[in-house]
């Protein structure tokens, strides 16, 4: 045995299992600007100290394994290991802690959300020492952000492309989501766009099924877009869902959309995967297409308060991977979304810089430097009576998307679109005049009903509709 091999195998190495906290719990550690920081909500198994649980998370999501290995001596663990550097008990919860973990930047491949998540959340969530584990937030350092392209275009470029300023954009998901032929689908798209909407949308599970193949849908929707544009003088779009079973097929659909000259395509970024999403985002930037992102399957990951991953992390990941719009809840509709928490990750999507604010669920100050912003999309169980609240909550840089709230109008699709456009214009005008949308919202809508019979009919249909359930996503 050579002296070199003898040194590796014997010096400083003792086989066996040792406590994680001896190596990975480092409360004296001063975080670096280049570290990726994570806030985990940790629920240890009975008898497991929080320091050991936090250290276990740091170890298993970086360089650690269940036993001491002699190859530890072949590298610098201090350079590459994750560190649990701070632990806070969760107020009002028994045996639950927020454990803060710092990861050296060298652990992650440049420009890869896939690799970042594989490391940080890929394996540790099944760890037996933990009863539950939730990733609440990430601080992405500027040095890592600059390795990503981010959104294909961003908010300002989109407004310039569409020539639409000073108000939220209006959309509609075509219903029924499945079962329509391509021609009938295109008819519904035309009627909604002709009535005053900016966008219509494929539902997330509309891909290329036997009743409506993707190429037929793309052709009829393009015809609807051009006809509506010619008649209204406004730029229109339809989110053509390019999501497919393979990346190659997805790109083929995006290429066809570009050849048709439409402005925007769509992707289901969680079910489709981050690698596919980043590839599509790169194609969209190179070819002038906007990219709408649907978050189908997000609630499987983020709905439970104690286990999984908060949507603010998925939102940050999307801003890195690339998308110009993303669904973000409504606060007021049928889908989950507590107001302050929702506004917290809406700001993370749009703003260049967000301060740490635990009251809104923001655990870290985050700078996005020159990364373009993403438009949040409010959709799910909303209708004209919600328009004042949505306009006040989300502001101009948003997309307000009414599916049933457009197509469910008693007079048809086009009058439903008219009702939504009139309600939005009335709310924007009232806001610009200094009126309080939160206090006077219903009055503003009723006043607009006097000169819009379409809006009056919509208000009558949905006057009693409410979705009042306790939000599970709380601080």
UniProtKB/Swiss-Prot annotation:
Compartments reported by the entry: Plastid, Chloroplast
Cellular component aspect of the GO annotation: chloroplast
Molecular function as annotated in GO: magnesium ion binding; monooxygenase activity; ribulose-bisphosphate carboxylase activity
PROSITE patterns documented for this protein: RUBISCO_LARGE
Cofactor requirements of the protein: Mg(2+)
EC number(s) given by UniProt: 4.1.1.39
Record-annotated site: Transition state stabilizer: 334
Propeptide: 1-2
EC primary class: lyase
A Pfam entry, by short name: RuBisCO_large
Residues holding Mg(2+): 201, 203-204
Entry-annotated residues carrying N-acetylproline: 3
Modified residues (N6,N6,N6-trimethyllysine): 14
UniProt binding sites for substrate: 123, 173, 177, 295, 327, 379
Annotated GO biological process: photorespiration; reductive pentose-phosphate cycle
Active-site annotation: 175 (proton acceptor), 294 (proton acceptor)
Catalytic reactions of this protein: 2 (2R)-3-phosphoglycerate + 2 H(+) = D-ribulose 1,5-bisphosphate + CO2 + H2O; D-ribulose 1,5-bisphosphate + O2 = 2-phosphoglycolate + (2R)-3-phosphoglycerate + 2 H(+)
Additional free-text comment from the UniProt record: The basic functional RuBisCO is composed of a large chain homodimer in a 'head-to-tail' conformation. In form I RuBisCO this homodimer is arranged in a barrel-like tetramer with the small subunits forming a tetrameric 'cap' on each end of the 'barrel'.
Job description of the protein: RuBisCO catalyzes two reactions: the carboxylation of D-ribulose 1,5-bisphosphate, the primary event in carbon dioxide fixation, as well as the oxidative fragmentation of the pentose substrate in the photorespiration process. Both reactions occur simultaneously and in competition at the same active site.
Quaternary organization: Heterohexadecamer of 8 large chains and 8 small chains; disulfide-linked. The disulfide link is formed within the large subunit homodimers.
Family: Belongs to the RuBisCO large chain family. Type I subfamily.
Full protein name: Ribulose bisphosphate carboxylase large chain
Source organism: Stellaria media (Common chickweed)
Name of encoding gene: rbcL
């Amino acid at each position: 045995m050579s002296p070199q091999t003898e040194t590796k195998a014997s010096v400083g190495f003792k086989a066996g299992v040792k406590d994680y906290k001896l190596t990975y719990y480092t409360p004296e550690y001063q975080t670096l600007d280049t570290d990726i920081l994570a806030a985990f909500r940790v629920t240890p198994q009975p008898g497991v100290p929080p320091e050991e649980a936090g250290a276990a998370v740091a170890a298993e999501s970086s360089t650690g394994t269940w036993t001491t290995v002699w190859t530890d001596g072949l590298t610098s663990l201090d350079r590459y290991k994750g560190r649990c550097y701070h632990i806070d008990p969760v107020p009002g919860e028994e045996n639950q802690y927020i454990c803060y973990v710092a990861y050296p930047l060298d652990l992650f491949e440049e420009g890869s959300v896939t690799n970042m998540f594989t490391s940080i959340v890929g394996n540790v969530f099944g760890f037996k020492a933990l009863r539950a584990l939730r990733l609440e937030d990430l601080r992405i350092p500027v040095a890592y952000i600059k390795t990503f392209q981010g959104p294909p275009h961003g908010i300002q470029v989109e407004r310039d492309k569409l020539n639409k300023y000073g108000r939220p954009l209006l959309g509609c998901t075509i219903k029924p989501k499945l079962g329509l032929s391509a021609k009938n689908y295109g008819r519904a798209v035309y009627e909604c766009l002709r009535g005053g909407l900016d966008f219509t949308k494929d539902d997330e599970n509309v891909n290329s099924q036997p009743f409506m193949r993707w190429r037929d849908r793309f052709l009829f929707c393009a015809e609807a877009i051009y006809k509506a544009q010619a008649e209204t003088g406004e730029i229109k779009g339809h989110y053509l869902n390019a999501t497919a079973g393979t990346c190659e097929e997805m790109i083929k659909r995006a290429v066809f959309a570009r050849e048709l000259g439409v402005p925007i395509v769509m992707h289901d970024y969680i079910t489709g995967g981050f690698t596919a999403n980043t590839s599509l985002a790169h194609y969209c930037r190179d070819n002038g297409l906007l990219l709408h992102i649907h978050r189908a399957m997000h609630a499987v990951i983020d709905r439970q308060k104690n286990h999984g991953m908060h949507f603010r992390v998925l939102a940050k990941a999307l801003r890195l991977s690339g998308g110009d719009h993303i669904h973000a809840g409504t606060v007021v509709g049928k889908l989950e979304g507590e107001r302050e928490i929702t506004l917290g990750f809406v700001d993370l999507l749009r703003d260049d810089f967000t301060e740490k604010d635990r009251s809104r669920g923001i655990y870290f100050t985050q700078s996005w430097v020159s990364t373009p912003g993403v438009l949040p999309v409010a959709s799910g169980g909303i209708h004209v009576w919600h328009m004042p609240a949505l306009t006040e909550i989300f502001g101009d840089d948003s997309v307000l998307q009414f599916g049933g709230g457009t197509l469910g109008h008693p007079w048809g699709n086009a009058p439903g679109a008219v009702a939504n456009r009139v309600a939005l214009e009335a709310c924007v005008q009232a806001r610009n005049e200094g009126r309080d949308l939160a206090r006077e919202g219903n009055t503003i809508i009723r006043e607009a009903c006097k000169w819009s019979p379409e809006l009056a009919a919509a208000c009558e249909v949905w006057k009693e509709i409410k979705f009042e359930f306790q939000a599970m996503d709380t601080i």
